[in-house]
Amino acid sequence: GVDSGVVLKKAIDVLGVNNVKPVVVKSELFRNEEFYQAIELVRSLGVEVLETEMAELEDDNIVKNTPESWYFSKRLLYGKLNEIKEEFNFNYILDGMIMDDLEDFRPGLKARDEFGVRSVLQEAHLYKSEIRELSKQHDLPVWNKTALCSLASRIPYGETLSLSLIHISER
């Protein structure tokens, strides 16, 4: 998305292409097109992309679809990213969380903190409008992309998540 794209662009500018390892995660809870667009963006920046997958619907804590399911989903994500970080001997995991995200209910922040993930855009006190402007200045094709959300967010809490229900919510 816009936020992660700016994080990646700035990381490449500061650290160089050989010192960043962008990871694009294919998730059952997001549209496939989001995965492929993210890969395209990374490649357009001239850096090697690492593709991986998550199987959220195999985790009962996520499938239960409670407000805390977001924590378990992020914990699964950050756990996978932490394994990759260790494999490649990198120091940090960076995400695209922004100041606007602090205004919402975000149980995933607990998982972020547990894994020591850096939200560098929040650390810089940047909001969505500023991120879009930075993205536009750097000619990133995602500068005006609409915010994406998990398909599970369209399903009421308490309704058990399944692949068929996720596909219905995608329509």
Model region roles, listed by residue range:
Residues 1-137:
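ATP-dependent adenylation/nucleotidyltransferase module used to activate substrates
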Residues 136-156:
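Histidine/lysine/aspartate-rich catalytic loop segments that bind and position anionic ligands
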Residues 155-163:
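C-terminal scaffold of the Radical SAM
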Residues 164-171:
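Residue-level detector of conserved catalytic or cofactor/ligand-binding positions
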